[in-house]
C-alpha cells in the first residue's frame, strides 16, 4: 500500500501546480528546487513530500486530467473542442443511406419527412480458413 498524504500536502501541491505548471517537470529533484523557490515551507521533510506529490500529479496530468486541478492550457483546449462546429452537417444531407431495419424504425418513430435511401446490408463474410 502507498503512503497516506495529508490535506496540507495535497492542497499545497495542487496550488503549486496551478500556478507554476510551465516550470514543473516529471523529475523529483527539479520539482524539489522549484517548490523551494516558490513556497515558504518550514521543514525539509514537508518540502520533499510536497515535491514528491507534485511529481506524482505531473505524471498523472501527462496522461489525463486530474480532479481539482484546473490548468489554463487544458481549459483552452476543452473550450476549443466544445466550440467546434463541422463545416458540413451529417444531418443536412439530401439522401441518407440506411438499411431496411433502420428505415422501419424511423417509420415507427414517425420520421416520415426524412428522405432515406435503402442499402443492402452486407454481413461480414467468412473466408475459407482451410486452404
Swiss-Prot record:
SUPFAM superfamilies: Rps17e-like (SSF116820). GO terms for biological process: translation. It comes from the Eukaryota. One of its GO terms (molecular function) is structural constituent of ribosome. InterPro entries: Ribosomal_eS17 (IPR001210), Ribosomal_eS17_CS (IPR018273), Ribosomal_eS17_sf (IPR036401). GO terms for cellular component: cytosol; ribonucleoprotein complex; ribosome. Keywords: Ribonucleoprotein, Ribosomal protein. HAMAP family: Ribosomal_eS17 (MF_00511). Belongs to the eukaryotic ribosomal protein eS17 family. This is Small ribosomal subunit protein eS17. It comes from Anopheles gambiae (African malaria mosquito).
Amino acid at each position: 500500500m502507498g503512503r497516506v498524504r495529508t490535506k496540507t500536502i495535497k492542497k499545497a501541491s495542487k496550488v503549486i501546480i496551478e500556478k507554476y505548471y510551465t516550470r514543473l517537470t516529471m523529475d523529483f529533484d527539479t520539482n524539489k528546487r522549484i517548490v523551494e523557490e516558490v513556497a515558504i515551507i518550514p521543514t525539509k521533510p514537508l518540502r520533499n513530500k510536497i515535491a514528491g506529490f507534485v511529481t506524482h500529479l505531473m505524471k498523472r496530468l501527462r496522461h489525463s486530467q486530474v480532479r481539482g486541478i484546473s490548468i489554463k492550457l487544458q481549459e483552452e483546449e476543452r473550450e476549443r473542442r466544445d466550440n467546434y462546429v463541422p463545416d458540413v452537417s451529417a444531418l443536412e444531407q439530401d439522401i441518407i443511406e440506411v438499411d431496411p431495419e433502420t428505415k422501419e424504425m424511423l417509420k415507427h418513430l414517425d420520421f416520415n419527412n426524412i428522405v432515406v435511401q435503402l442499402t443492402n446490408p452486407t454481413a461480414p463474410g467468412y473466408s475459407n480458413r482451410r486452404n
